[in-house]
């Protein structure tokens, strides 16, 4: 399955919440009716079954992190094998993706842009170029923008936008050096309360 390249606002409207697929600090509900699904009949809301609710939650999280269906299922399997809460393990695996860490550090305005930076070899981990967006970053790893990419206007613009957002506590960033440290895995309380990972666990447990 190919990645979705259509209108980003349409995906957020489909899920009824801001998926943070657009750059900027202004909430997208100020731009469009976020609680109304796209399309001619978007205002009609059918009552979802339990399965439908679980499926929507899975799709929402998958779209937030820009992960394809097969990848997402593999993440769930890995999370289920680990000790502890499967849902929290899943979120930590998604948060540990290099493209997501680049986004959290502010080098990319969106996860999609951060994925592109990684793919274009603009990012280094512990002094080595890594061009795999799904690369798992470990605690204490140092992530930085490659020297020849530091002049890119989009990276500078992203850091300015990131400066206006609430900073994640599990990463530490030196904006001047365009370098950051992944201090620890985020705890559940660090992440969005809008995500109900238990619904995803229930979906895949069937």
UniProtKB/Swiss-Prot annotation:
One MF annotation (Gene Ontology) recorded for this entry: rRNA binding
Signal peptide, first to last residue: none
Keywords: Ribonucleoprotein, Ribosomal protein, RNA-binding, rRNA-binding
Keyword Cell cycle: no
Record's keyword annotation contains RNA-binding: yes
PROSITE patterns: RIBOSOMAL_S4, S4
Annotated Pfam families: Ribosomal_S4, S4
SMART domains to which the protein is assigned, alphabetical: Ribosomal_S4, S4
Alphabetical GO biological process terms: ribosomal small subunit biogenesis; translation
Family that this chain belongs to: Belongs to the universal ribosomal protein uS4 family.
Protein name per the record: Small ribosomal subunit protein uS4
Species annotation: Aeromonas salmonicida (strain A449)
């Amino acid at each position: 399955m190919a990645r979705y390249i259509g209108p980003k606002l349409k995906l957020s409207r489909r899920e009824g919440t801001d998926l943070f697929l657009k750059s900027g600090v202004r909430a997208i509900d100020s731009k469009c009716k976020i609680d109304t699904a796209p399309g001619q009949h978007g205002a009609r809301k059918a009552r979802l079954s339990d399965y439908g609710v679980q499926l929507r939650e899975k799709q929402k999280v998958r779209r937030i992190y820009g992960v394809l269906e097969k990848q997402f299922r593999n993440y769930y399997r890995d999370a289920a094998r680990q000790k502890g809460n499967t849902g929290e393990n899943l979120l930590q695996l998604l948060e540990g993706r290099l493209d997501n860490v680049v986004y959290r550090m502010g080098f990319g305005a969106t996860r999609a842009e951060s994925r592109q930076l990684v793919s274009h070899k603009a990012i280094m981990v512990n002094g080595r170029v890594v061009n795999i967006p799904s690369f798992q970053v470990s605690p204490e790893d140092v992530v930085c923008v490659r020297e020849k990419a530091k002049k890119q206007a989009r990276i500078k613009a992203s850091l300015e936008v990131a400066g206006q957002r609430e900073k994640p506590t599990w990463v530490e960033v030196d904006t001047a050096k365009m370098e950051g440290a992944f201090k620890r895995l985020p705890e559940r309380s660090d992440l969005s309360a809008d995500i109900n990972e238990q619904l995803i666990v229930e979906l895949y447990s069937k």
